[in-house]
Every structure is written in C-alpha cells, then in structure tokens.
C-alpha cells in the first residue's frame, strides 16, 4: 500500500526565510537561496563546465523542496552556449508544496527576473500531488525534470539512471536523519556514473563516514554564508562491487530505428524517438495508421483506483498523468488530437463498491483534481441523466480519438519519419550490428540498428519470443445515431460497460469481451449486450434497448492484445536463446540479470489501456535506448518488462 502524500506547510522565519514546521529547518540559507545553489551545488559539482559538449547530463538531487537548485541549474544551462544537448534533473520529495504555496514562496523570495520566469514555468507545469514519478519537460524537451513524490528511502533505490552529479540537499541531518543514511548513500552509489561528483552543504562526521563507506571520496571546502565548511567529492570506489552497472546508451553507428506497427503503441514510440533526433522508419501492413483497435471512433482514458494501490493502479497513474502532459505538448506544437474536456465518470456496480472505492480515495488523500467520490445525485448532475449509483469523477479523464492522436504524433515527428504502408512483416534477423526486416515474400524491407515491435498480436511472432503469453480479445462497439439518447449524455460514463458522447452527437457504447474469438462481423447479440450493460448504469438506456433494432445498428469490431497478467509488454527484449543456454545459472535471476537482445524492444499487449500506457511506454523505451533516467520506478518497469514471463519460467525451471 502506498502511503498518502502529505504536502509541505509553507511558513517563514521572522527574517523572511522559508522554513518547514515539520522539520523545524529552513529551506535555504538566510544569506540567499539562489546564491547558495550557485555556490554549493553548481560550483561544488564543477558546473556548467562538466556538462559542456555532452549529449546527456544527469543531476540527481535528494530533497526538491522549493526547487531552487533546479531553477538555478536550469538558468545556468540556458546561459551556457556549450551546454549539453539534454539536461536531466531527477529529484525526490516526500512533502511537496501545493502549487498555490509554490507560487507564494516564489513571489516572496525570488527577485531575479530570469529565475522568476523559470519559476513561473515550473509552477505552471507543477504536477498533481499524487505519489509516484512525474516527468516534466521544458525547453522543447531539452530540460527534463523528473520528480518522485515519495519517501527517499523508498524512491532512491527505485531509480534507474546513470548520474553525473549529486546534489545532497535534504534538511539538516539532525532534523531529517532519514535522508542521510548509509542506505541512501548506497543507493546513490548504485546510480553513479564514471566521474560522478557530489556536493553538500553539510560536513558532519557521520556524513563523511557514510560517503566513504559507499565509495565516495570527499574533501572539505569553505562553506556558504555562515557555514564554515561543506563537502564536495566524487564517486571513486576502491573495488568494483556493483552487481549491475547504471544504464548506458546503446552504441549505434546511426541513430535509426524501425518501428513495426502504427497504432497507439507504435506512433507514440515514433514521436518520442524523433523528439530525440532519431530517424524512424515505420512499417505498417495496412494503408494508414490506426486501422485496428486504435481505429475505434473514441477511447476512454482514466487512472485506476484500488484499495491496495496495486501495480496496475500505480502504472496507470503514472501513465495517465504523463499522457496528459504529452498531449498538451502536442497541442502547443499545433498537433492536438481530438479529445473531450468535461472529465469522466466511473459508476459503481453497487453501493458496496461505491463505499469501498470512496474509502480508498479518502485513505489515499487524492486531490480533487485527480479524483473525487460523487454520490448518485451529484453523478447525475455531471452526466445529465439519471444513474443507478454514485461513483467517482476524474476531472481530467475523458475520451480521445485514437486515430487523431496517432496522426498527431506522426506529424510531430516531421521529416525524421519515413512512413511505409502495405508492408506485412514476417520476421527479423540480426547481422553485422543491424536488424534486417523481411516481409512475407521473403524480401528485405528495412535495415536499422534498432527495431521496436509494436504490432500487438504479431509482435511475439515477429520478435521470435516463446515466453510472451498474449491472447486476443474480441471487442464489439455499438454506435447510436445522434438524437437516440435523450437527454444527451454530457460526458463519458464507464462501469460494467461504457457510453461516450461523440462530437458529432452520436453515442458510442461497448464493448464486448470475447476471448480468442476471431470473428470480424458485427453481431446483433453483441449490440444488445452492450446496450444492456450500459442500461445497468444509465437507466435511460433501458428504453433504447426496448426500441432498438440491433440489425440496423452501426458498430465496429476490433481485437485487444493482452497478456495473462493483463499488464503491457514494454522495454528491451530478452535474448531467450542465451537465457535457455544459461538456464541453470539464471534460475535465481532478477530482471537486470537477464541477457538482453541488442537493439530490440517491444511495445505491445496494451489491451484496453493503450491511451494511458502508450506515451509512458514510448518514453521508457526511448530512455532505455539513450541511457537516460527511466520515467517510472524500476519495480514498476519490471512489472511491465517483456522478459517477466521468461524470468518466471527460469525460476520455475521450465526453460530448456
């Protein structure tokens, strides 16, 4: 169970310095927060010199606080003509400020106009206060802030990245000892890249001993303001004792990737790679993008709520919030997909479920902008028609046209994307550091050092995977013409089924759930099933069921690709041949122990959650390729790792 997030309380000392009543300590020196950040952290880590001419540079901070260190680092990056191409700043925070308090503290403490403008941009992008990883992008994606709202004792060990510099900036060790433990420093040591440096305002003896024990060399230098001394140093272990090295970028002769499949999964990967300067060749067997499940007239998107905050809830929460930011960025570029803006209402199956989820929402202390419980009368007001029960409302949930999203992402990729349609991929082979892609006629259709298989049901076959238990689920939609639903539905309503009011006045309902059924034809009993399920949530639909001529109704059939655990397959694929050869040695393996196939990645089995998983999955794959910080916690990445089924088979001794 994830602990609820408790926001910071904004307070000021008599001299105007912001401080935390919880820790009874100040957020920065009374001499000046900007000056302290420059002196202690930039100068202490030899920045900006060390990031110059680098492609990617990653800073890891313990304790985001007001974000002053990030703002000063960002400003230094902007001012440096020799800056790195991409600056990552990763920070943890157990008690983040609300956006209103963040704006107040900036207004009260920042007078520098450049920093104030950056502070405004950060406040405008400030995420909802829910636990987990939040990735924010600035400067057209060249400055990336990854915030982890969680206790550092849990979040730092869950990071997966290669750090170039550490900002050790929690409250004083005497006030906040949990942030200065050997366990924290050991976790940081596992993240340190070659030549990684650190700086901290503290010079306490316990800190020096812990740093030394974890492989860091330190030296004492003059402190900032009234502090006599501070520590700076570097990661220089005497022995190589790490089981796994931090992630590194894939070394390729050319940054060129082939993406197989152009549904939600593939188009998201295309955009994320092109945003990093990769040339992409897309291969699609149909004549256009989004022709299978991604071609439905609309799809709904929302996070999951569960009493235990399950893995699925955590992944969908991260994916949902990342998707919202990603779509907003597309809209700012002029490539906005077609989507609704009134929110989404989820209806409980009965009063017991309504109470259970209401209690889960209250226990998690979720902000109302994320989700709120609504009784039946309030739910009815939101929906514009009577409802069977109350439920919960997602103000930023809703519907989106998947095909428009796919088109927007391809358009955003611009000239870096070469699109090829009518190509039915049969298999791939590795030779000479390149992947060679063959069609069903045996002809070579593409070559590249990287292939991302995003072709749903065909993905495991194309990639040659034996341990990828995917299945097909037939889903039939029913489309009610404009004027059928009276009064009209105001927003998407989901529960046992779903009903979505479309922009043209029609109402989309669905969907059936038929395992391993290949029939592509519309069925009258499927239409009746859809309408009957919706009528259980929305009694007004009962009359539609009675009046409907199912044979005359329009609809669509598509097929969802799912795994046995209903989680997606996202990330670098394992080398199953090597794993089989070393099966005995790998019987007690962990995900990072598994042999991986160079340059081969998967993005498939998204089921009915492609809208909340596709953008995050694409960002994860791009981050793995580039050796960048991952956009979600390592344990969650392992729960969607395509190699997880191979790992289970190895542990069970069934790989041969």
From Swiss-Prot:
The keyword tRNA processing applies. NCBIfam families: MnmC_Cterm (TIGR03197), PRK01747.1-2 (NF002481), PRK01747.1-4 (NF002483), tRNA_MNMC2 (NF033855). Gene3D superfamilies: D-Amino Acid Oxidase, subunit A, domain 2, FAD/NAD(P)-binding domain, Vaccinia Virus protein VP39. This is tRNA 5-methylaminomethyl-2-thiouridine biosynthesis bifunctional protein MnmC. Catalyzes the last two steps in the biosynthesis of 5-methylaminomethyl-2-thiouridine (mnm(5)s(2)U) at the wobble position (U34) in tRNA. Catalyzes the FAD-dependent demodification of cmnm(5)s(2)U34 to nm(5)s(2)U34, followed by the transfer of a methyl group from S-adenosyl-L-methionine to nm(5)s(2)U34, to form mnm(5)s(2)U34. Its cofactor is FAD. It is found in: Cytoplasm. Residues 260-656 are annotated as: FAD-dependent cmnm(5)s(2)U34 oxidoreductase. GO terms for molecular function: flavin adenine dinucleotide binding; oxidoreductase activity, acting on the CH-NH group of donors; tRNA (5-methylaminomethyl-2-thiouridylate)(34)-methyltransferase activity. InterPro entries: FAD-dep_OxRdtase, FAD/NAD-bd_sf, MnmC-like_methylTransf, SAM-dependent_MTases_sf, tRNA_MAMT_biosynth_bifunc_MnmC, tRNA_MNMC2, tRNA_S-uridine_synth_MnmC_C. One of its GO terms (cellular component) is cytoplasm. Keywords: Cytoplasm, FAD, Flavoprotein, Methyltransferase, Multifunctional enzyme, Oxidoreductase, S-adenosyl-L-methionine, Transferase, tRNA processing. One of its GO terms (biological process) is tRNA wobble base modification.
